[in-house]
Structures are given as C-alpha cells and as structure tokens.
Amino acid sequence: MSRPNKEPRYRSGLEKRVCNNLRNRRIKFSYEPYKLDYTKEVKQGFCPECGSKVMLKCHQYTPDIVLDNGIHVEIKGKFTGEMRTKMIAVKKCNPDIDIRFLFQRDGWCTKNHKMRYSEWCEKNGFDYAIGEVIPSEWID
C-alpha cells in the first residue's frame, strides 16, 4: 500500500532538484502526468501490402513536468542525438503543445563542437533555459 504524499521516483538527481525548487517556490506542476503519442519513420521500411517505403511506428513520450499553465518542460543533463530526433517527432505530432527544455548546461550536440543545445533549440523552434531553475517567465 502506498502513501498518498509519497514523493515520486525521479529519473535523475537533476529532475529531483528542479521539482524541489518548484515546490519551494509554491508553483503548481505535475511530474510525468501522462504520455503523448507520436510517430517516427522506420528507416528502410517496406509495406508488403501496398509497396510503400514510408513506414511509421507509433511511440509515446512522457513529459517530465507539466506546469499548471500547460507548458511542458523536458529536463535534460545530456541531450543525445536520439533524444533530439525524438523531440522533433513529438513536436511534429503535437504542434499545439508548448514543449520547452531546461538544460543543466549548454553542452555540445556533437563531438566536433559545431552546435550547442541552445542553438539546436533555436533552429528547431523550441524555447529553452540553462540551469536548474525553471524561469519565472515560464510560470507567470
């Protein structure tokens, strides 16, 4: 039997610190409240019935935090290529949902240091912040 006020199991220490900061600021939010559906194209896919080479696979994405104003916040330490591809697909399939990123630091997307996380967000139309605190302007 679980306790009603039991703290959720966070996926990282960063998520826990961000959520604790929101609680300390008395900001209402939900942690991983639901899943959003999205599709990704299957590489080298083939439909045996119609012969189409365009195949889609259904996936689900769980936002880290949803603020009471409807803003979805994805909290990231490391931001891999796989995650970047996934988030573009999530946004494409859910265009009316405001998804933003809170990065622990503005790291490099690639080993050759050609693009930072912030530059990737700007290029792909995502709002973002750097640090461990959700900006006040996202809440007001």
Descriptions of predicted regions:
Residues 1-140:
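Nucleic-acid endo/exonuclease domains
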